[in-house]
Amino acid sequence: MKRTVIVGALLAVGAVGAMLRAQQPPPSPEASARQADLILSNGKIITVDERFTIAQAVAIRGDRIVAVGTNQEIARLAGASTRRVDLMGKAVIPGLIDNHMHLLRAGTTWVKELRFDGVESRKKAIELIQARAKALGPGEWVFNIGGWAHQQFADDPKPFTRDELDQIAPNNPVALQESYYQVFLNSRGLKAFGIEENVPDPTDFVKGSIMRDAAGKPTGIIKGDIAATRPVAARLPKVEANELEASSAALVADMNRAGLTSFGVAGCNADVLEIFQKWKAQGHLNVRTFCIGGAAASTPEQADRSIQQIAQMKLFQGDDYIDNVFFGESVYQPLHDPMFALKSNPRPDQLEQWRRMAMAIAKAGLPLHVHAELHDTIDAFLDQIEAVNKEHSIRNLRWTLAHVNQINAPQLERMKKLGMYAAVHPWAVINGGIMHEGFGDGAYDMPALATIQASGIMWGFGTDATAANQYLPFTTLAFAVTGKMPGGLKVIKQTISREDALIAHTRKNAFLVFHEDDLGAIQPGKLADLLVLDRDYLTIPADQIKDIKPTMTMVGGRIVYDSINAAQPKIVRIPSERR
């Protein structure tokens, strides 16, 4: 990646300075109209524009960037009321965009969960379990719903056992869901679910998913992909209605702390979306939410009804904070391939229903964002899409295959010819060890990031968090550059440059959520979503990328996370100024 540098030597990395009020003579009316509300200077501004320009300073007016350049150039935009941040050499990047996360669903459990995202030590995980049990008191559930796998524990990468969890939290039921692969329970957790020795398995669990030893005693493991883990998650406590807003606020705060500012959201939970709408009206919604939803079907009869609904479906009725942008992620539910299946076997009758619905989506002129994981599923869907395209062109609809962990070069070429895009969600970030157990050396190309990048297709990063995967974007970026899971296990060989990885998490994702004119780069006219980092993404050793922390997160010119005042994020209210 060629970088264009427009500044000289930069200052050494240090703490973000306090905002300093500019001391200049009163500006003329003409100058006041041009002056910035906020200037960040003395930094390394990694713009992620088309030339990957590096600048020193950025000026913001209202919710948008008005100028990027040298310290001297940007200083000319300061006025008497301009606020300043001295970056003291720190790196700044655009706010990170996740193109596919189940964000709103997570709000229904977030404050109840014990998250292991980014935890690289089993010792640390045990300490977290013990601390949560102590804080909650006896009898309360200690649980999480995915986002981790035991192979990320560098000190002791093995599964939890029933006896071990009994010792760690003897007075609490425990359920630790490992991605969508398996769940570890202690004795109290098993009893709470009615799973006991010499007692038939509960009927809502998938047959054979409850592991037992030779004597018939439950081992504490529920195993067998999403269908097997779903009954556990369904029985775990969700927040009460009067707690939902606080849980959603904690979720958004954690996303901002991680450096995430915008999302393609699969399945926009109506109750949480209503809260987001309220926050937007009040002027303090701190993430941008671009919904992926629609009338998916499970039977031919439902497909008939869905086709009628598709004809009436309208997208792009929102704004740059909340909007509906895609039909998806499922079209015909029986073709939803599980993430840990070794092979998919799409049936002709199922593909016929999928094609009928896809034809209706194309006829209605709607964008499509569809789950497609395994090689066979991707081929089958491309066959159907090519047939649809002969009757209704999809070239300008930004149809996107999502997940695509087994995609290959011929499939990418077929997608390019159709004008399609790829939303890449590398499950190997946490599931690499599990995938190698199932796919052997083939897992080293899951996903084939170098092949995807070399294909020239438009693509971007997402996670499919918070159950299937972890949500931390710098963990994803580190994985893309090093091929390593948290904990250091090398699980893929096809890596990409740190510049290409960052572009895929910013500028290209802005395109995938239909906001390329507003998001994804630090450029004049774009929304002021940006991060100040505690270290330089471009120069630190690759193995340290996962450890990068934002010291400040900004959304639309408002500071929504500030590590210096992390307990009470500094909200700077700046009136919106539209172009």
Locate predicted features.
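Boundary at the C-terminal end of the N-terminal hydrophobic targeting segment
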Residues: 20-22
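Accessory "access/gating" subregions that flank catalytic or transport cores
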Residues: 315-317
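Bacterial N-terminal signal peptides
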Residues: 8-17
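Bacterial N-terminal signal peptides that target proteins for export
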Residues: 1-9
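His/Asp/Glu-enriched, well-ordered alpha-helical/loop segment
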Residues: 359-369, 373-399, 403-404, 409-413, ...
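Ligand-binding beta-strand-loop-alpha-helix segment within the catalytic cores
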Residues: 421
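Divalent metal-binding segments
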Residues: 24-41, 46, 50-311, 320-377, ...
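Glycine- and charge-enriched low-complexity intrinsically disordered segments
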Residues: 562-576
